[in-house]
Amino acid sequence: VDALSTDGGCIPRNVTLKAGLELVDLDGLTMLEFVKKASLMPARILNLSSKGHLSVGADADICLADPIAKAPVRVISGGNTVFENGKIFNGTPTAFTTRKGLDFYNDQGIPAREVNPSFEPLNRLN
């Protein structure tokens, strides 16, 4: 399995975090494998080069989680805290969608970013 992800609104938020940390607890994944499959690999599949990693030029999106509670504690987006200890502070979520979904989000007044998924073989080494 290259990536852990959800397929949109029918799946509750944070299911990837909760389920992924349960896999870590069961020794199905190491913590490093979980982080890679929940962040870096989905970003690569969706050709989002500024997402899924912490490095110079990246978007500075970070989720700090409590591994015991299997829940987010703090979320930083673009360098700004947008969620902490159950409270949403500010910011507007951005939907990631293919071209076919852009009109739907625009009609709803929800910011959306077009993604072009890659079906090329992934570089799994780094």
Question: Model features per residue range: what roles?
Answer:
Residues 12-18, 22-126:
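Active-site microenvironment of metallo-dependent hydrolases
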Residues 9:
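Active-site beta-loop-alpha junctions enriched in small/polar residues
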Residues 2-6:
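Hydrophobic faces of well-ordered beta-strands that scaffold small-molecule active sites
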